[in-house]
Amino acid sequence: MAKISRAAYADMFGPTVGDRVRLGDTELWIEVEKDYATYGHEVKFGGGKVIRDGMGQSQRPNTEAVDTVITNALILDHWGVVKADIGLKQGRIAAIGKAGNPDIQDNIDIIIGPGTEVIAGEGMIATAGGIDAHIHFICPQQIEEALMSGVTTMLGGGAGPATGTNATTCTPGPWHMGKMLQAADAFPMNLGFLGKGNASLPAALEEQMLAGAMGLKLHEDWGTTPASIDNCLNIAEKYDVQVAIHTDTLNESGFVEDTLAAFKGRTIHTYHTEGAGGGHAPDIIKACGELNVLPSSTNPTRPYTINTVDEHLDMLMVCHHLDPDIPEDVAFADSRIRKETIAAEDILHDLGAFSMISSDSQAMGRVGEVVCRTWQTAHKMKVQRGPLAQDSERADNFRAKRYIAKYTINPAIAHGIAHEVGSLEPGKLADIILWRPAFFGAKPSLIIKGGMIAAAPMGDANASIPTPQPVHYRPMFGAFGRAMQQTRLTFVCQAALDNGVKEQFGLQSPLSACRNTRTVTKKSMVLNDLTPQMEVDSQTYEVRANGELLVCEPAKVLPLAQRYFLF
């Protein structure tokens, strides 16, 4: 049998079992665990290559063949690091395995026919589209920024640059909810909106659910009292939706123990659980030890660096409508920004005690940096803490799976949309991001939305080939017209679907109901389910998990930073 070198094989078909790939300029390496290819029978498109009539391309009609095949991609997902072909059909993932022509090849999972388009995945990393579950919908331009970074689902609240939206992730009331659902039809992004949950009686919350909310948000700026928490969670239990909470920084209506007691063991998603983004000062971080709490971070504190504390004070004053001339406002800001808890947050992510990472877009968060901040945190922890026990000096597969789960499958599970998005698995929406390894985490090479290319770096449109400068991210055909509407989802609750919200507001995009949100616990958070016994010293702000003091140094330099964004 003819053989080629491992290096030559990787150049031609991408890495195979035992090969390692560096993620961007981080110190993280992943190793291929499985390759679905049959050596010598790989499919590849191009002049003189395999996917041609009667060779790798069969005669099968499109009823049997896939619409699109991504060839020889290296998949990085919470479930594995595998090399495979990915078949797409009707905007969803049809199969992951071996593609080709079953008339002349054995063990074919994905049939290539005359109706099949090809995307070359050789040498590329494929990940699921990211999910940002903490969005202030302040301006529509956020959506393009997020899409170009590798995010394909945005969940949160707001109604434009109103003062309330600038501070809180709530789309309040049926009128605003309806208008935001109508606006959602215009964007190549899966969207879901959270109603305002701050009320002590149920009627005003129920009408938001029937108007199309996919969940509710409790925010301290609207008064997150034990009574409003209890009422909001009662509605969530009734309508099977998730509640997100920004707790009481000032401890006006109670302390962290009172808030945890108000949960009454019911599931809740705690936003920026470290507290710099808001929450009981100084000890909201203790919530990550509770079984019913699904803790997330927002990206300005990811990871802890020499600049983190300084920039937060200015952000806080602007976002929460504070006045630097009022001493009480300054004291409020100072109470929220603590280097000790921010440093501990790094380690809690590495331990799997914090389960999700999101942005907090334009409200103390950067919407285009969820992905890169996640991998910067993973890198910092690898450098400072070494390989995880489940990994070796050779590769960081477990750590990579843990961190990618924080912005893909775990927010999907938390908000009841994992049946649609959050991972690369058959049956799910084909929201797929392709990365060149050298640019992993910073700049995607292709953004596939609902099976159609929605965005990509693209050169001069008047050039003779696609690559001449200036190359920058541009919307593609999947971002336009009816095609865009049919390759995205708007998430609502089942009651809104039953109430005819699609017809009521004349919505064009498919709607999908969230489900199974009330049975989720911390143990449902994939690879991020640790519930440590948490202690916080109220004077020194020292944080301990299971008795261990959590301390790390701020980073002075990070990967996936300046060298990637000069242009």
UniProtKB/Swiss-Prot annotation:
It is found in: Cytoplasm. Ni(2+) 1 binds at H134, H136, K217, D360. Its cofactor is Ni cation. GO terms for molecular function: nickel cation binding; urease activity. Pfam families: Amidohydro_1, Urease_alpha. Ni(2+) 2 binds at K217, H246, H272. Residues 129-567 form the Urease domain. Keywords: Cytoplasm, Hydrolase, Metal-binding, Nickel. Binds 2 nickel ions per subunit. The active site is at H320 (proton donor). The keyword Hydrolase applies. The keyword NADP does not apply. Pathway: Nitrogen metabolism; urea degradation; CO(2) and NH(3) from urea (urease route): step 1/1. It is an enzyme of class 3 (hydrolase). GO terms for cellular component: cytoplasm. The modification N6-carboxylysine is found at K217. Its EC number is 3.5.1.5. Carboxylation allows a single lysine to coordinate two nickel ions. It catalyses: urea + 2 H2O + H(+) = hydrogencarbonate + 2 NH4(+). GO terms for biological process: urea catabolic process. Substrate binds at H219. Belongs to the metallo-dependent hydrolases superfamily. Urease alpha subunit family. Heterotrimer of UreA (gamma), UreB (beta) and UreC (alpha) subunits. Three heterotrimers associate to form the active enzyme. This is Urease subunit alpha. It comes from Hahella chejuensis (strain KCTC 2396). The gene is ureC.
